[in-house]
Amino acid sequence: MAQPRIPAARGAAASLQAQNGAASASGSPYTNGPVHNTLMSPQVSSSQGYDSQPPGSYPRPMPAKTLNPFSAQSNYGGSQGSGQTLNSPLVTSGPVLPSLHSGPVPRMPLPTSQNPAATPMPSGSFLPGANPPPPLNWQYNYPSTGPQTNHFPHVAPPTLPGNPNLTADHQYVSSGDPALQTSFKKPGSALPLQNPPLPPTFQPGAPPGPPPAGGPPPSRGPAPQKTPPRAAPPPSFNSAVNQEGITSNANNGSTAAHNTYDEIEGGGFLATPQLVNQNPKTSRSVGSAYPSLPPGYQNSAPPVAGMPPPSLSYPSGPQAFTQTPLGANHLTASMSGLSLHPEGLRVVNLLQERNMLPSTPLQPPVPNLLEDIQKLNCNPELFRCTLTSVPQTQALLNKAKLPLGLLLHPFKDLVQLPVVTSSTIVRCRSCRTYINPFVNFLDQRRWKCNLCYRVNDVPEEFMYNPLTRVYGEPHKRPEVQNATIEFMAPSEYMLRPPQPPVYLFVFDVSHNAIETGYLNSVCQSLLDNLDLLPGNTRTKIGFITFDSTIHFYSLQEGLSQPQMLIVSDIDDVFIPMPENLLVNLNESKELVQDLLKTLPQMFTKTLETQSALGPALQAAFKLISPTGGRMSVFQTQLPTLGVGALKPREEPNQRSSAKEIHLTPSTDFYKKLALDCSGQQAAVDLFLLSGQYSDLASLGCISRYSAGSVYYYPSYHHQHNPVQVQKLQKELHRYLTRKIGFEAVMRIRCTKGLSIHTFHGNFFVRSTDLLSLPNVNPDAGYAVQMSVEESLTDTQLVSFQSALLYTSSKGERRIRVHTLCLPVVSTLNEVFLGADVQAISGLLANMAVDRSVTASLSDARDALVNAVIDSLSAYRSSVLSGQQPGLMVPFSLRLFPLFVLALLKQKSFQTGTSIRLDERIFAMCQVKSQPLVHLMLTTHPSLYRVDNLSDEGALNINDRTIPQPPILQLSVEKLSRDGAFLMDAGSLLMLWVGRNCSQNFLSQVLGVQNYASIPQTMTDLPELDTPESARIAAFISWLREQRPFFPVLYVIREESLMKAAFLQSLVEDRTESALSYYEFLLHIQQQVNK
């Protein structure tokens, strides 16, 4: 039965420019999604890569009215308003097609081959039709860009068993934070300390002797001839001429001049064998400081709330490396291991087994690899794939109806991180992959890349292992023993001297802003954390305030007090005395402190109600553009003056109407300014503190496209809303003190045959696959969609590698590399067995946000539901033998319907008029920028009973005992009036206390005598000297650790105003506009059985 075409999809081609930004003067469109590879398509036409065919019919209709009891709240048609045109594109030095963020367009299927001639995608689903396979992306159909241009015969990657015995003294290099010291003793000496910290850098000397005696090393071909060095034009930070692979391979270690970060990351220093003296005694010292025991950083960090405990499947130390080819017998043995995991082979009837939620945090599936390979794999907290068994062909992926993609948390805080300071960074000469645990050493002199299969020479320096102080063991080097590693980049990876840490604060000081009292909190937090700002002696700081005019503050050393400089012409902003506005923090610290102490009182009597945010941002950009850095902007109302002025668009009675909802920006000013900031290595973080509509859909662009962050505090007031004050202070502390990387770029590579075509997150896509990140922080997550471009029948393993090149706050250029290895499978059953339901749900959420913005909220909701229907239909028709009653799902997808239902009830996609527009936009911002673990906790909260906490099964972390109560289903059935239940919703904690809760809990934890004495607005637990109070305080403190947003706590009585929010989060129960979990399962079953 054909489904009518969704109105939002009509006119897709006509509104292309409106949905993807604007075209530059050269005809290159600013887009939010995939772009052409300029290597393959140097000529760009105005219509290139876009599929303007109308969407086809969809064979399985999903009427919105069947999902929502109130059809008037769920039937949305029509398209969104158009965007604006960018008038001043970024300067480029070649035919580049920049792409911004992840571009929303009216269709949102799963990734697939980008064939322009393919059948158009049905608009009501993420998933393809049956025959022929249509293109599966939520974007227009660009030709996909494979990461490699050189194809080589495949040799299976090696197996990596064993564990070396390290006996020498070794030392760590810190990961950017102040070094901690310890030493590891030789055998026979004292035992090492428990949980040893990291010592300072150690530079090993030359090898103790000549290379081991034996036959001559394998002969190598003649070294390529060197070419004359190229002249280096002036740096252009928003230029990305050279694509991946277009770099001279003739350097052979010589220093080359580079003019773009794209070239530096994609083709920088070529680690090839050099003409060196073969006598190590007379040659220069090789090697450098390495971690003494390439540490098991994956397992050393204390468990994070909401994440499963670290699995023993991930490395905890250096692993011995026996290079034996992985043959068919190895894979057969690996596949036979499936019988050891009967749970994975289970088929579940969800209508009979509804309680499938585990009582402990859900663990990601372990890839079906040999143990020797898996123990070297990347930690899934950092890098994970939606399918841990990669389909061999695109046809098999289409048949599974599951998305293929990656979710990354590349800059996550790590307790221990192996850092390599060698002058030689070994990379593939063809695809520029960094050497990693999954390459294959053909012999001691040659290694085969696991992404493009090119055979590379092993540099002479790489033959010496400073860990073991043995020559001739390249496979035991730290680079080949750790899936996550950081390199200290040599000067060849720099376009200019590393930029200093620059922090510019921009404050709204209008009457409305002063009334909220936020300036007192922010200035006090800055005073408290001024010495903790990441940086060094070069750190610079500056301040701008604005209302209807713009105020600068001269902090020149030698002044007795700060001087205010006022610019009243907001139509032509200029910078007065620019050399005195951004000052060295150490040299002008007293003036900075004086300003922060007096600033809140300077505007207490202001009557100015206008807000010139746009001109203030222009001024801030001009001030920070020579160096780059971070702008922190605080805004409390809708901008009303100058460029970027906005008008109210919210209709309270039509907040979820497809025709009236305003999820798209009303102006392109903030997007254009963000592009300019990105080009000058400046990021903008937005703090919105407003009780009124402020058009976050427009304002948020300034952070989204400059790799910044958005913080939102609705109804902030220093007296009327103390919870928001606490939240702001806690989040400012983390924001000001967390690790930061400047002028960063990130590239994701994958094995030949796979293709990345869409990115999600806060960044600017500078070239085909290079993400520009002026700032990178530990709380940022990213996602990508992929397709199988070429058949993987000739390989048994595929690998993915992300490389993040950044400048630390200490002025060091570093490269953090993560490598993930996964098996390739040829059957549909194996694909389903390896499905990662959390990663799938997270990727679909990102895709649904784009669909909401570019089509309609109704389209996004229907597509989420259809994703479940299509995948379970494929499993039923292609894997199950015979028709079985009920809703049969593979064990790996047992929580898929539950997570999708939770997404439908999340603020981003919830129907009804109770969600304010800015709140919905902020929820969508979180979906697009949060790491997966935090996104899933926001989507599907964790519920615990806490009135009977005990030490049984507790965690012991740093002499703290952390109770671990079981996780309960999100249903009122699990509540009881004689208990107390804590819900962890990521950025919110709600403690629901039953009317008949025990007197012991009331007195020993809440500090009240009876239930009626619980305050209506209780937001903190008293610190009582009782075991019960200590247990729950430790548990809540543990939950709050390492969260990007501080979760405030509300204590809820049965009569509390917050009770509605608590019940709304019980996603398995029916609400006025959404089905219960059981009703949703019945609906899914009805659609699957059609």
UniProtKB/Swiss-Prot annotation:
Which residues fall in a compositionally biased region of kind Pro residues?
194-236
Regions of biased composition (Low complexity) lie at 8-28
| Entry binding sites for Zn(2+) | 428, 431, 449, 452
Q: Where in the cell is it found?
A: Cytoplasmic vesicle, COPII-coated vesicle membrane; Endoplasmic reticulum membrane; Cytoplasm, Cytosol
Where is the segment annotated Disordered? 1-260, 272-325
Task: Answer whether the UniProt record assigns the keyword Lipoprotein to this protein.
Answer: no
According to its record, what are the GO cellular component terms?
A: COPII vesicle coat; cytosol; endoplasmic reticulum membrane
Q: Name one GO biological process term.
A: endoplasmic reticulum to Golgi vesicle-mediated transport
Query: What keyword terms does UniProt attach to this protein?
Result: Cytoplasm, Cytoplasmic vesicle, Endoplasmic reticulum, ER-Golgi transport, Membrane, Metal-binding, Protein transport, Transport, Zinc
**Which superkingdom is the protein from?**
Eukaryota
Q: Where is this region: Zinc finger-like?
A: 428-452
Q: Give this protein's Gene Ontology molecular function annotations.
A: zinc ion binding
The UniProt regions of compositional bias labelled Polar residues, in chain numbering, are 29-55, 138-151, 162-184, 237-258, 274-286, 313-325
Return the Pfam families for the record: Gelsolin, Sec23_BS, Sec23_helical, Sec23_trunk, zf-Sec23_Sec24
Topology in membrane: Peripheral membrane protein
Q: InterPro entries recorded for this chain?
A: ADF-H/Gelsolin-like_dom_sf, Gelsolin-like_dom, Gelsolin-like_dom_sf, Sec23/24_helical_dom, Sec23/24_helical_dom_sf, Sec23/24_trunk_dom, Sec23_24_beta_S, SEC23_SEC24_subfamily
The UniProt entry annotates Gelsolin-like repeats at 963-1036
According to its UniProt entry, what is the function of this protein? Component of the coat protein complex II (COPII) which promotes the formation of transport vesicles from the endoplasmic reticulum (ER). The coat has two main functions, the physical deformation of the endoplasmic reticulum membrane into vesicles and the selection of cargo molecules for their transport to the Golgi complex. Plays a central role in cargo selection within the COPII complex and together with SEC24B may have a different specificity compared to SEC24C and SEC24D. May package preferentially cargos with cytoplasmic DxE or LxxLE motifs and may also recognize conformational epitopes.
Subunit structure comment from the entry? COPII is composed of at least five proteins: the Sec23/24 complex, the Sec13/31 complex and Sar1. Interacts with TMED2. Interacts (as part of the Sec23/24 complex) with SEC22B; recruits SEC22B into COPII-coated vesicles for its transport from the endoplasmic reticulum to the Golgi. Interacts with STING1; promoting STING1 translocation to COPII vesicles in a STEEP1-dependent manner. Interacts with TMEM39A. Interacts with SACM1L; this interaction is reduced in the absence of TMEM39A.
| Family statement drawn from the similarity comment of this UniProt entry | Belongs to the SEC23/SEC24 family. SEC24 subfamily.
Q: What is the protein named? A: Protein transport protein Sec24A
This chain's source organism reads: Mus musculus (Mouse)
